[in-house]
Amino acid sequence: MLKKIIGIGVSAMLALSLAACGSENDENASAAEQVNKTIIGIDPGSGIMSLTDKAMKDYDLNDWTLISASSAAMTATLKKSYDRKKPIIITGWTPHWMFSRYKLKYLDDPKQSYGSAEEIHTITRKGFSKEQPNAAKLLSQFKWTQDEMGEIMIKVEEGEKPAKVAAEYVNKHKDQIAEWTKGVQKVKGDKINLAYVAWDSEIASTNVIGKVLEDLGYEVTLTQVEAGPMWTAIATGSADASLSAWLPNTHKAYAAKYKGKYDDIGTSMTGVKMGLVVPQYMKNVNSIEDLKK
């Protein structure tokens, strides 16, 4: 029977994960034995956790335990294990700063439990593009790469303020900003409310676009919420736009729930990925199927 441990803190997760690593990095032990059949996850309501539930069923990992807490707890646990070269399996996704900080690898997913590659979309409330075509033009033209986003994520993870790092990025990448703002006019105090999910990637993108909008004369409000409330805010019109829609897999349920109540005005990033992730020093596991051995 698949087991879940929900809503624990950083200290508790560290204790659980380190206890799970009873075999340490014994290459003769199976991956299941090395991690005591435990996967370290993130927030229980997130899309990647739902997909991980599906993957565990698809691959008959019914006697495994999926631990859920915050993404901060997950990365703290990863750091603790990585520094000690302990085996660990986590739920992971790119873009994320941990792939720049650590040598990690995705486990192959031959059954496609996590679906095909994701994209990050920009969505708006209904009517926004007609009411604010200038801002909508900027948002629809916003596109960047994982490496570019990574410039911001890694600095924020190191303790710098998102707004400060975003301003530095905008000042450094003037040609790119010129592409995003092509045909966009300056305004005087027009208001815009951007809702975003508190993921490192969305903190980066929302702060950058927030800075660009401010430089164009907009009065910008950034509202941090969970994924569900973000979609609700767009659907009900309490927020104007969000750069945080991960489709077609992560936010599939929300997109279906609010179909017809929002507009998708562009894709800011392609090639986004999620799945089960391990350190590269775990040589004996390369596929989710290996976890059954």
From Swiss-Prot:
Keywords: Amino-acid transport, Cell membrane, Lipoprotein, Membrane, Palmitate, Signal, Transport. It comes from Bacillus subtilis (strain 168). Its main location: membrane. Residues 1-20 form the signal peptide. The complex is composed of two ATP-binding proteins (OpuAA), two transmembrane proteins (OpuAB) and a solute-binding protein (OpuAC). Interacts with FloT. A lipid is attached at C21 (S-diacylglycerol cysteine). Involved in a multicomponent binding-protein-dependent transport system for glycine betaine. InterPro entries: ABC_Gly_betaine_transp_sub-bd. PROSITE patterns: PROKAR_LIPOPROTEIN. It is a lipid-anchor. GO terms for cellular component: ATP-binding cassette (ABC) transporter complex; membrane raft. GO terms for biological process: amino acid transport. It is found in: Cell membrane; Membrane raft. One of its GO terms (molecular function) is transmembrane transporter activity. A lipid is attached at C21 (N-palmitoyl cysteine). This is Glycine betaine-binding protein OpuAC.
